[in-house]
Amino acid sequence: MLYGILAAASALLLTAVLSAAVRLPALRLGIVERRRGRRVPVLGGVAVMAGVGAVAWVGEWSGVAPLGQEAGRLIVAGAGLGLLGLVGDVWRLPAVLAAAGVVAAAALVVPYHELGVLGGVCGIAWIALVVHGFKGMTRSDGALGVVGAVTAFALSGCAAAEVMDGLATLFSVLAAALTGFLMHNWPPARVVLGTCGALFVGFVLAGGVLHVYAVGYGAGVGAPFALTAVATVDAVLVLVSRKRAGRELWRGGPDHLAHRLRRIGLTPPGVVVVLGMLAAGSAGVGLAIHMLWTEPGTAWWVAGAAGAVVLGMLFVPVGPPRGARAGAGSGTGVVPAADGAVARRARATGARDGPTGVHRVPGAAARRSIPGGRAPGPSPRPSHLGRQEAAELGRRGWVG
């Protein structure tokens, strides 16, 4: 008990420190992605993976909390997937290769002895689906951190009930590490998990659910589904919507659950809160089913709610969130730096193009002078404060 508290606290603090430490190297090396016009480092997954691995290794090395065979395979396979994702964060990684890596790693950790060959194959497919759902949450600040922490916390309770101490410790450490990471990932995020963290967290959680289910399968398949309902909903929503639209299933786009919640008017923190509440509700049902506090049929309510969410979100158009300015090339309401430079030069000089009586406005058609009337005068010169603000926005790479 005491070691569990110390391990969770250590993982939280260590991951928080590492998440702050990886920002500067990622910015200098250009391992970033643009979110709403900001350059955000994508090495948060390295911090989470290092924090969880360090605490787990200390417990195994000291003999105070040995992980056991199941937890050891999970963390090693998850770390391998995380390294594969890190390659994708630094260089472009084909989606097919990432999917093949998930399938290969799942094939190494599935408990065939308890599930059988057919059950093991179904487990591999289910792990791939859930990992895909968790991976999609990285596109929204804070979403994967909150949903992953809630799921890991509930899963640690399930593992403790089955006296799987190694897995229970691993999941509690992962929940604490994600909580520490959220200190830097809450909207607007200062660092994100990237593909590395998404594959590591998603795989450890999905594989852990399968291991716990293999031991306590008397509760039925409702508990594993409820524990990962939010990730499953996101994966199914994306696959169905892309299939209906005739798009490639593995090509990314703004069609995940978090994107659609933004489209209906939620703010970025609001999206995180809603997803966290959904994850807490569904994971709580899964924990209750596994602990035999409620009937296994309760999972049908979760399945019905999940189906309603998928059907409802299919009618939400895919695109930039409401309130984003039209004409933004990236769909985020941010004017590209090149267009902003042209507009700033035009405002700063108040230049005229063409003969007298014609004043050309950048990006708009020229206005003809009225015969016998006065020609439009030049645009007023911006104030000194306006020029300073435009220069600062241009230095950051965006306008507006």
Region annotations inferred by a language model:
Residues 321-400:
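Long, low-complexity, intrinsically disordered cytosolic termini of multi-pass membrane proteins
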Residues 263-285, 290:
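Alpha-helical transmembrane segments of integral membrane proteins
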Residues 21-23, 312-328:
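Membrane-interface capping segments at transmembrane-helix boundaries
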Residues 158-161, 165, 215, 241-244, ...:
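Juxtamembrane transmembrane-helix termini
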Residues 297-313:
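Small-residue-rich transmembrane alpha-helices that serve as helix-helix interface/gating elements
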